[in-house]
Amino acid sequence: MARKAYQPKRRSNSNQNQQRSDSLKKNKQDNLRSKSAGNQQGNEKNKKDIQDQRNKASTKKKRESSGEKYESARDKVIRRFRPGDNALKQLRQYNQTPSLLIRKLPFQRLIREISTRMTEEDSLRWTSFALVLLQTVVEDYMVSFFEDANACALHAKRVTLMSKDLALAARIRGQKNVTGIFIPTKK
């Protein structure tokens, strides 16, 4: 006995269409009630509602044609980027900006913490210019180090940067005491 292949249920707009038709029926019923009752206020209210609906529809069309913002999130066109396009876009933005990439205050706290660990004095005093200069040097060093590590990954015919690439880049540079880099060993 052959089994049928699983076919997922397709979503349709029937629910939305049902809601629209229900609201139209309700409006028609309200119009008939107000006419039969002879209520002038109800007629004026319904006329205003109908005019408002027409105005909304016309402004929506105008917005779509003129390129203005859309009325709701459902009306937006979802744009999909190819994989890697957003990363390249961010890299271009970072290359164009002359500002520092690492936040200043966390970097200053780290420098002060390291300087208190290295010296026996209570605290060294740093000028703001010295901290900015140190930060630019550190960022340049990190960029060049990651470029070397990326070259090691490409040499291994990989795109993913791994810890062994960082260790190899540090070893080629002649840095023997590289801490924080875990090199897995095979048993």
From Swiss-Prot:
Please provide, alphabetically and separated by semicolons, the GO molecular function terms listed in this UniProt record: DNA binding; protein heterodimerization activity; structural constituent of chromatin
Q: In which compartments does the protein localize? A: Nucleus; Chromosome, Centromere
| Start and end residues of each stretch annotated as Disordered | 1-76
Q: Fetch the Gene3D superfamilies from UniProt.
A: Histone, subunit A (1.10.20.10)
Which residues fall in a compositionally biased region of kind Basic and acidic residues?
22-33, 44-55, 64-76
Q: Which UniProt keywords apply?
A: Centromere, Chromosome, DNA-binding, Nucleosome core, Nucleus
CDD domains membership: HFD_H3 (cd22911)
Q: What residue spans carry the Polar residues bias annotation?
A: 34-43
List the GO cellular component terms: chromosome, centromeric region; nucleosome; nucleus
Q: Which InterPro entries match?
A: Histone-fold, Histone_H2A/H2B/H3, Histone_H3/CENP-A
| Family annotation (Pfam families) | Histone
SUPFAM superfamilies registered for this protein in UniProt: Histone-fold (SSF47113)
| Major localisation | nucleus
Q: Basic residues bias: where?
A: 1-12
Per the record's keyword annotation, is DNA-binding included, yes or no? yes
Tell me the subunit arrangement: Component of centromeric nucleosomes, where DNA is wrapped around a histone octamer core. The octamer contains two molecules each of H2A, H2B, CENPA and H4 assembled in one CENPA-H4 heterotetramer and two H2A-H2B heterodimers. CENPA modulates the DNA-binding characteristics of nucleosomes so that protruding DNA ends have higher flexibility than in nucleosomes containing conventional histone H3.
Family in the record = Belongs to the histone H3 family.
Q: Which PANTHER family match?
A: HISTONE H3-LIKE CENTROMERIC PROTEIN A, HISTONE H3.2
Role according to the record: Histone H3-like nucleosomal protein that is specifically found in centromeric nucleosomes. Replaces conventional H3 in the nucleosome core of centromeric chromatin that serves as an assembly site for the inner kinetochore. Required for recruitment and assembly of kinetochore proteins, mitotic progression and chromosome segregation. May serve as an epigenetic mark that propagates centromere identity through replication and cell division.
Q: What name does the UniProt record give this protein?
A: Histone H3-like centromeric protein CNA1
Q: Which organism is it from?
A: Tetrahymena thermophila (strain SB210)
